[in-house]
Amino acid sequence: MKLTVWTYEGPPHVGAMRVATGMTGLHYVLHAPQGDTYADLLFTMIERRDHRPPVSYTTFQARDLGSDTAHLFKDSCRDAYERFKPEAIIVGASCTAELIQDDPGGLAETMGLPIPVIALELPSYQRKENFGCDETFFQIVRALAKPVEKTARVSCNILGPTGLGFRHRDDVEELTGLLSEMGVDVNVVAPMRSSPSDIARLGAAHFNVMLYPETCEAACRHLERAFQQPYTKTVPIGVGATRDFIAEVQGLTGVTGAPDENRLRLPWWSASVDSTYLTGKRVFLFGDATHVKASARIARDEMGFEVVGLGCYNREFARDIRKLAKEFGLEALITDDYLEVEKAIEEAAPEMILGTQMERHIGKRLGIPCAVISAPVHVQDFPARYSPQVGFEGANVIFDTWIHPLVMGLEEHLLAMFREDFEFHDAAGPSHHGGHAPKPMHDAPAASAAAGAEASMAEETAAPSQDAPAATGGDVTVWLADAEKELKKIPFFVRGKAKRNTEKYALEQGVTEISVDTLYEAKAHYAR
C-alpha cells in the first residue's frame, strides 16, 4: 500500500459494493471501522443514485479492538436481515478489518440465517477493485445459479454491468435493443438490475454476453463449465467491433437477423470534409483494458488518428494490452501510478488524450485536450441524457465526445493565419473572454518588433520559460528573436517538446544563445 492523492482502483471491497449496489434483494454486510464507511458518498453523490447502497457496517472503533469484535459482526448481520429482509447476504471485510482476522464468512455461517449467506475472500493487500467485482459476482453466481430449462426462443444473459460503471446503464439499454433487432431475447442482465432469484435462472439462456471482462469473466467461465453456455469474446464498442459482435452472436446461435444501421453516423461523419483534419492526430490512450482496446481500434481504423501511446491500470489484463501495443508498434504502459502516466503523456506530446478522470486533470495541466473513455470517472460522466458507448448509437456518441475537445481544421487554419494579429497573437488571451483572459503560460510572450533581439534576450534571461531546464552554474540559455519566431511556426502540440529538446541540446553543446541554426541542429540531432 502507498499514500497517494489519486488511485485508479479502490480496494476489492469497493468492487463488492459495486456489485451489491447494482442488484436488488441482496445485502452486503461489511466488517469495517468507522473510516471505511463511504459507500453512500460513492454511489449517491458521484453516480447520483436515488437510493442508498445496500451495505451495512459493523463500524468498530479503536476502543473495541481490546475486546472481541466478532459479536459486533454477528449483531450487524442479524440486524441487516431483520431490517431489510434480503433474499441473500454477502459478507466480507474491508482492507482495515482484514488485519484483525475475524473471519466474517465463518461467523455468518454459524448464525443459521434462513437465506443464502455468501462469504467473500477478497485479499485487500494483493488485489484491487475490478478483481473485487469479478470475484464477488462469480461467488454469487456459483452459489445461486441452478440448472433450469432453456427458454423457447434464443436468449442470452448480459453480464458485467455494475454500480459506478462507466455508462453501464445506457450500454445495457443499447445492447438490449441491438439484440432484439437480431431476434435474441435478454433473459437476465446481471449484476445490475438483477436479484438473487434472477441469478438462479441464468442457466435458462442459450449464451452469455461478456460485456465487461473486468467484472464478469470468472462468472462467464463458470457458466460455460456448469451449464454449457458459450459466451461472446467481442465487446461491441465501435463500428467494427459491433459488426464483429453481431457476426459472433450469429455464429453462436444461428440467427440471421441483423440490426438496422440507418442510425449509424460515425463512418460518414469521420469521412466528411472537415473531419479529414482528424487524420493523423496524435492520441494517447489510458484506462481500463476493455475500453483502451476498443478505443485504440476506433482511433486508428475509424477516426484516422495516430496512436502514440497506450496503457491500462488493471494488471490482470497486462498481457492483452502489451500484445495490442505491439500491433501499434508501441510499448504498453502498465501502471496504477498517475505520475508515471503524466510523465509518459508529457514525453509523447500527443494532440489529444483519451483516458479517465485523472487524465482529464493531466490534460488541463499540460494544455492538451482530453476525452474520457473509461472509469474511474467523476459526476459529470454520469449524464442525465442517453449516452451509451456500445452499439451503433454508442459509436455516434464516441465520435461526438472525441471531437468536441479538439480545434477543428478550419478553426486552426484561421488561428494560424491571424497569429500575428494584435488581437489573436500568442500573448493575447482568447478573444471571447474579452480583456479579462489570463495570459497563456506555456510560451514566453514574443518580443515586440521595436524591442528587437536585445529586449527578447533580457526578458528570457530575467524570466526563463517554465519549459526550460534549470540552468547549472553560470550557464544561462536565451532565445534570440529570430529563433523564437521560428519556434512559433512549429505546431503548438509539439512546440513544447521542440523547445525542451533545443534547450537541452544547447546546454550539452555549451551554447548560451539559441539561434535558428541551433534550433535546426537540435532537430537533426534528435531525429537520428
UniProtKB/Swiss-Prot annotation:
EC supergroup of this enzyme: oxidoreductase
GO molecular function: 4 iron, 4 sulfur cluster binding; ATP binding; metal ion binding; oxidoreductase activity, acting on iron-sulfur proteins as donors; oxidoreductase activity, acting on the CH-CH group of donors, iron-sulfur protein as acceptor
Lineage: Bacteria, Pseudomonadati, Pseudomonadota, Alphaproteobacteria, Rhodobacterales
Binding site for [4Fe-4S] cluster: 36
Pfam families (UniProt xref): Oxidored_nitro (PF00148), PCP_red (PF08369)
Name of the protein in question: Light-independent protochlorophyllide reductase subunit B
NCBIfam families reported in the protein's UniProt record: DPOR_BchB
UniProt superkingdom: Bacteria
InterPro entries linked to this entry: ChlB/BchB/BchZ, LI-POR_suB-like_C, Nase/OxRdtase_comp1, P-CP_red_C, Protochl_reductB, Protochlorophyllide_Rdtase
Gene3D superfamilies the UniProt entry points to: 1.20.89.20, Nitrogenase molybdenum iron protein domain, Proto-chlorophyllide reductase 57 kD subunit B
GO BP term, example: light-independent bacteriochlorophyll biosynthetic process
Subunit structure: Protochlorophyllide reductase is composed of three subunits; BchL, BchN and BchB. Forms a heterotetramer of two BchB and two BchN subunits.
Known function: Component of the dark-operative protochlorophyllide reductase (DPOR) that uses Mg-ATP and reduced ferredoxin to reduce ring D of protochlorophyllide (Pchlide) to form chlorophyllide a (Chlide). This reaction is light-independent. The NB-protein (BchN-BchB) is the catalytic component of the complex.
Binding site for substrate: 409-410
Active site: 274
